[in-house]
Regions:
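The AdoMet/dcAdoMet-binding core of the Class I SAM-like
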Residues: 1-120, 124, 132-139
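Substrate-binding/catalytic lobe of Class I Rossmann-like enzymes that use SAM or dcSAM, i.e.
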Residues: 128-170
Length: 170
C-alpha cells in the first residue's frame, strides 16, 4: 500500500505503470483499485516467484490476472534500458541491494528509470529500514544515486509492523 498509494495521490493522471520486482502481486493488487490506469508492465526476473505466490498467497496475488497487466520475465535493469518516456509511474519493489538485485541500485539503473518516465512521471523505490546500520548505509548510497538522475527527490516513511524494525522508507 505505501509503495503505491502516495504516488497515486500526488500524480494527476497515471495511465501507464512499470513495476520492477513485486512478483508477489501486492503492488498490482493496489494499482487495480485505480480504473484510470490503462497499462501495467510488471518485470519480475524469476517466474517461480509469481507462480509460488499465485499458489500460496492468493490474497496478495489475486489481481495478477488483471487484463491491464503484462508480465515480463526479465531483468529489470535490462528491461528499462529500452524504454523512453513511456511511463507515468515506475515502482521499484526490489530485493536487497546485493546479490541478484544489485543492478537495481546503480546510477545507470536510476538514470534509465528517469529516461523511461514521461516529463511529469514519478519513481518510487523502497529504501529499507533506517534502523539497521547496513540497511541505512545502503539506503543513503541508493538515495545519493537517485539524486544524481532525478532533480527532485524526496523520502517518505511508513510504519509497517510486519517489516523488520516496523519502520520503512520509500
Amino acid at each position: 500500500e505505501m509503495i503505491t498509494h502516495p504516488a497515486m495521490a500526488v500524480h494527476p493522471a497515471v495511465r501507464d505503470v512499470l513495476i520492477i520486482g513485486a512478483g508477489d502481486g501486492g503492488v498490482v493488487r493496489e494499482l487495480s483499485h485505480y480504473p484510470e490506469i490503462e497499462h501495467i508492465d510488471l518485470v519480475e526476473i524469476d517466474p517461480l516467484v509469481v507462480e509460488a505466490c499465485r499458489q500460496h498467497l492468493p490474497q496478495t496475488a489475486g489481481k495478477l490476472d488483471d487484463p491491464r497487466l503484462h508480465i515480463h520475465y526479465a531483468d529489470g535493469l535490462k528491461f528499462v534500458r529500452a524504454k523512453d518516456a513511456c511511463y507515468d509511474l515506475i515502482i521499484v519493489d526490489s530485493t536487497d541491494p546485493f546479490g541478484p538485485g544489485e543492478g537495481l541500485f546503480t546510477k545507470e539503473f536510476y538514470g534509465n528509470c528517469y529516461k523511461a518516465l514521461r516529463e511529469d512521471g514519478i519513481m518510487i523505490n523502497q529504501h529499507e529500514s533506517p534502523f539497521y546500520e547496513a540497511d541505512a548505509l545502503a539506503m543513503q548510497r541508493a538515495h545519493k544515486r537517485i539524486c544524481q538522475s532525478f532533480p527532485l527527490s524526496r523520502i517518505y516513511q511508513a510504519h509497517i509492523p510486519t517489516y523488520p524494525s516496523g519502520h520503512w522508507l520509500f
